[in-house]
């Protein structure tokens, strides 16, 4: 049976890639299962994807493997694209402030770069290109 993808997942910079290198095979397998759910389910359960209350537009992908808990920070871009920023292994109930600050910084940087690229494209193609 062919899966139908509703969303795509993209990585911004290398922070998520570096985090991923630290994960065990079992955690990676679980992570890819959660990614598949996120890409194919119309409504994603909060068990797997939840907004970060303190930062507008930022979300956390939630992964549990055994007693280990992991969070991958991300955002939506135009509704159907999920941009991955950085990840952590949670060791306490509270998400570390420095990890949230980093994710917020990366999200702002992503949208600033995107806007710059769109402005450059608009300049190159002229005002009537869209």
Protein language model features and the residues they cover:
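Basic, Lys/Arg-enriched alpha-helical interface segments
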Residues: 1-69, 78-82, 90-130
